[in-house]
Amino acid sequence: MYEGYRQIELLIGPFVEGELTNPDGTPKKGGSALSIISNGSVNTMRVQASISKSIFWVSNTANIIVWNLKKDTINRLRRPGQNVQVLAGYENGNMEVVFSGGIGYVKSERQGPDIITTIMCKTGGMDMLKSSMSISYTGGTSVKQIVTDLAQQIPGITVDPEKINIKGQIGYAGWSFVGSVSDALEKLQFQYGFTCNIDDGMFVVNMDDEAPSLSIVLDEKSGLKRVSPQLYGLFFFQTGWDIESEYVQGVRPGTSITVRSLYEREVKGGVHTMTYNLCPKTNQWDMNISMLNFFGSDYS
């Protein structure tokens, strides 16, 4: 089935992160955001997006470059409180959100006949550092309940309790904490074996000892380019795998993937960190993935 040109769409507006995204991650129709579209056709703009994402508690970042924007559009990007969503996919409408965050810095400069505008963005993960509270729970309370309550105190994100699948409960002595939400979550992560982050405006939790049940296959047919072991130290201790592939929809931090290479054995595990490098005009359509030796990875 022909899916049309590869395509990137930027949605820019003062909306809250995730506001233009449905619960399943697909973009909502309509809205007042400014739309900038780039694909292989001659009548769209050139856009390049370099995006870094992780399951660990760090902000996801995006470096977006747009060629020859109008001055009014550049001025809009520089207004306080502007956010951006990056959608990637194909012109037939099969698009997914690969980044949602706030605009931190905008720079425009002339390069020959072109005006190059660079937009530097970051997710709302750093909002957690500003969120402080005092909280206490009686013994026997589920860890899931505590994490859900903490996440709901973070401004500007969506929390779905059904997607917080954390096992265990606190001891009979109870649990109390005074300080920032980030410190509280870090303490719970270390004790109960999970990781959490904000991914495109959604609060996401992954257990360290199990990967999600649905696995996406990366092979030569889907655009797999390279898979190589991460080696460390004098005795070449393997710490994980590095994977390079064409961009495949649905792969994001926390996703379970199966890698089938003609030159390496089959590898299964969860995505820990990844980068997207997307530019439809130059046919750059790649992702680089790091899988570490935990989170359900199969290295046997």
List each language-model region with its residue ranges.
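Short beta-strand-centered interaction patches in the first periplasmic/extracellular domains
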Residues: 114-128, 158-232
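Short intrinsically disordered coil segments
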Residues: 26-27, 79-82, 118, 134-140, ...
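Short beta-strand segments
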Residues: 96-99, 133, 267-269
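Amphipathic, non-transmembrane alpha-helical segments in extracytoplasmic/periplasmic proteins
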Residues: 62-67, 80, 121, 134-158, ...
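Short beta-strands and strand-coil junctions in structured, solvent-facing domains, enriched
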Residues: 71-74, 92-93, 109, 127, ...
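Extended Gly/Ser/Thr-rich low-complexity repeat segments
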Residues: 74-85, 130-137, 255-259
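Assembly/oligomerization scaffold segments
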Residues: 1-120, 274, 282-284
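An acidic/polar, Gly/Ser/Thr-rich interaction patch typically located in mid-to-C-terminal regions
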Residues: 49-77, 208-300
